[in-house]
């Protein structure tokens, strides 16, 4: 029995102990379970957590609350961001409604464009520091029509608006009929240049230039990159000083035509003088302003370049201008004398005239420019003024002339007194121009002996005494030129050029630098060589030094000086008593292409000789006798 029990126990133990196969299968089973756990770790963890939640219901509740808080926080942040965006958009829309450039857009702009336009608008408002705008000039109790009539009545003129691009008359008041005798319908839509004097067109075009007005800015859309079209209606604009305009011009006057016989016009000069009366001098005062083309009722161009461009116009009041005639003042009331400033070339030609001269002489500045002052001097005062002309070219001091007569536009003479001084270029040491301050002298000042204006010590020399005739020869009577009033001499403008040539010759012979006309046409047309004879037939001796005559042009006696070619009787002004029409005819008769080429060749030889670049100069090719 005991042996049977031992066998049964050993058999059971063998059966219960794992064999090699069992160990392999057991190991494979264990590894398979591990792999399943690795592949299904998340599900296992979830199951474990579910088991844990089942085991702990309080933890499950906390997890649910945490997930709800996260979801609520996300929803609250989205709502906050949405409200912030809505508020910003509302502010952007409100800002766009306040900015005129944005409000005028036909489509909605992006935020960046709105902000850019707002910044530009703020800069514009900051720059508008001048409180005097157009709206401030008009009282509140006056309407626009009442104010217009009051201004026209006070100014005694007419209001007109002219486009700066083509000079088209956009508007003119009815009062233009009282001044120009044109109706309102006759002028509106016409070109202003058709009614201007031909010599004043360039001046008016210069005044219509709108380069100094406010520049127009082109806005670019940030999304499309294309220029933004603006249809902004400008508010009250500032009257900046650069936009103001004040000028004189001559306009046609529509006077009734009267049939005149041909005998009433003996010459063409008198016809031109009669035609000159059809123009009247208008003083225009106003400013430049810009309007949208749609507001003016004009046709807009559909071109892209013209988009957003405003129309620049000249708004001005035209008044009939009449020159001031000085009246004698009775009593002890002293007022400031009327004067004007002019600038002349060294030959006496006008290169600048102050606008005050129009009120005194009735000439427009553009009428005097390019003409010689000797054309307006009385023939009895030319001798004294020519001597002053020579002195001011030779000295740096101010020269005060005696009282002289100056011809004004209507043919009469006005008494003036001038102070002349020459301006010398500090670098080239050359006289560039002469500045003249001309003061009107009243009749009572001449009669009363005002110490400010010293009396003439002697009667002024006439032109004939300054320019004596040939030795023992009788004086010729000069023919009168139709259209030129008496008191002046035809060809007197030649005197200034001859004086300039004489002074240039003096400086050149002395070896000093010539005057500023060395580079001007005066030096080309004249300047005889140093060994050439003077107009009187005298020659400069070799080695001789010219002497400046002390008496100048006023002396009537001949002074022999072999070393100076232009002294008194042999002066360039004293040799020919008839320098008027005779010298002009001689100069015109000797002008030809061949003569001009020969003259230029001689001049180039002179320049090379002065610079030491050439040999002796041959004067045999000159077309005129020396």
UniProtKB/Swiss-Prot annotation:
Q: Where is this site: Important for interaction with CLOCK?
A: 125
Tissue expression summary: Hair follicles (at protein level). Highly expressed in the adult brain, skeletal muscle and heart.
Where in the chain is the Glycyl lysine isopeptide (Lys-Gly) (interchain with G-Cter in SUMO2 and SUMO3) cross-link? Answer: 252
Q: Which UniProt keywords apply?
A: Acetylation, Activator, Biological rhythms, Cytoplasm, DNA-binding, Isopeptide bond, Nucleus, Phosphoprotein, Repeat, Transcription, Transcription regulation, Ubl conjugation
Question: Reported effect of changing residue 90 to E?
Answer: Phosphomimetic mutant with no effect on DNA binding or CLOCK-BMAL1 transcriptional activity
Biological function: Transcriptional activator which forms a core component of the circadian clock. The circadian clock, an internal time-keeping system, regulates various physiological processes through the generation of approximately 24 hour circadian rhythms in gene expression, which are translated into rhythms in metabolism and behavior. It is derived from the Latin roots 'circa' (about) and 'diem' (day) and acts as an important regulator of a wide array of physiological functions including metabolism, sleep, body temperature, blood pressure, endocrine, immune, cardiovascular, and renal function. (Microbial infection) Regulates SARS coronavirus-2/SARS-CoV-2 entry and replication in lung epithelial cells probably through the post-transcriptional regulation of ACE2 and interferon-stimulated gene expression.
The protein's name is Basic helix-loop-helix ARNT-like protein 1
State the species of origin: Homo sapiens (Human)
């Amino acid at each position: 029995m005991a042996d049977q029990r031992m066998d049964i126990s050993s058999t059971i133990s063998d059966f219960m102990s794992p064999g090699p196969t069992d160990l392999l299968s057991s190991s494979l089973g264990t590894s398979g379970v591990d792999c399943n756990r690795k592949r299904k770790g998340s599900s296992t963890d979830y199951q474990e957590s579910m088991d844990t939640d089942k085991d702990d219901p309080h933890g499950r509740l906390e997890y649910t609350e945490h997930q709800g808080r996260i979801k609520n926080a996300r929803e609250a942040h989205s709502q906050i961001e949405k409200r912030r965006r809505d508020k910003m958009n509302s502010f952007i829309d409100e800002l766009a409604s306040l900015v005129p450039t944005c409000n005028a857009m036909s489509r909605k702009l992006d935020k960046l464009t709105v902000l850019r336009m707002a910044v530009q608008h703020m800069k514009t408002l900051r720059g508008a520091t001048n409180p005097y705008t157009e709206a401030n000039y008009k009282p509140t109790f006056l309407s626009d029509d009442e104010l217009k009539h009051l201004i026209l009545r006070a100014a005694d003129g007419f209001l007109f608006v002219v486009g700066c691009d083509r000079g088209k008359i956009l508007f003119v008041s009815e009062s233009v009929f009282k001044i120009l005798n044109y109706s309102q319908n006759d002028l509106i839509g016409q070109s202003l240049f058709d009614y201007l004097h031909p010599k004043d067109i360039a001046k008016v075009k210069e005044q219509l230039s709108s380069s100094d007005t406010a520049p127009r800015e082109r806005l670019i859309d940030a999304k499309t990159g294309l220029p933004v079209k603006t249809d902004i209606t400008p508010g009250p604009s500032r009257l900046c000083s650069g936009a103001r305009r004040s000028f004189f011009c001559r306009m046609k006057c529509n006077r009734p035509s009267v049939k005149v016989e041909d005998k009433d016009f003996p010459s063409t000069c008198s016809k031109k003088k009669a035609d000159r009366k059809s123009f009247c001098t208008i003083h225009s005062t106003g400013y430049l302003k810009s309007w949208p083309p749609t507001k003016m009722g004009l046709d807009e161009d559909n071109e892209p370049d013209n988009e957003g461009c405003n129309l620049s116009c000249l708004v001005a009041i035209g008044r009939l201008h009449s020159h001031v005639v000085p009246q004698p003042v009775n009593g002890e009331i002293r007022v400031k004398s009327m004067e004007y400033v002019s600038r002349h070339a060294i030959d006496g030609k006008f290169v600048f005239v102050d606008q005050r001269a129009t009120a005194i002489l009735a000439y427009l500045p553009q009428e005097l420019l390019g003409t010689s002052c000797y054309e307006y001097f009385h023939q009895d005062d030319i001798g004294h003024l020519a001597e002053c002309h020579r002195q001011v070219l030779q000295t740096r001091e101010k020269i005060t002339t005696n009282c002289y007569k100056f011809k004004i536009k209507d043919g009469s003479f006005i008494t003036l007194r001038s102070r002349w001084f020459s301006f010398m270029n500090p670098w080239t040491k050359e006289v560039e121009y002469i500045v003249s301050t001309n003061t009107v002298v009243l009749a009572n000042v001449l009669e009363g002996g005002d110490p400010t204006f010293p009396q003439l010590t002697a009667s002024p020399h006439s032109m004939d005494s300054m320019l004596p005739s040939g030795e023992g020869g009788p004086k010729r009577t000069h023919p009168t030129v139709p259209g030129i009033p008496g008191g002046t001499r035809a060809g007197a403008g030649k005197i200034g050029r001859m004086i300039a040539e004489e002074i240039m010759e003096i400086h050149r012979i002395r070896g000093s630098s010539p005057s500023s006309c060395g580079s001007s046409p005066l030096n080309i047309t004249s300047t005889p060589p140093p060994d050439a004879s003077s107009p009187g037939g005298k020659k400069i001796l070799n080695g001789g030094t010219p002497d400046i005559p002390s008496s100048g042009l006023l002396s009537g006696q001949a002074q022999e000086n072999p070393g100076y070619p232009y002294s008194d009787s042999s002066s360039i002004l004293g040799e020919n008593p008839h320098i008027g029409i005779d010298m002009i005819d001689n100069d015109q008769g000797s002008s030809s292409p061949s003569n001009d080429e020969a003259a230029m060749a001689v001049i180039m030889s002179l320049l090379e000789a002065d610079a030491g670049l050439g040999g002796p100069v041959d004067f045999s090719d000159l077309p005129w006798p020396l």
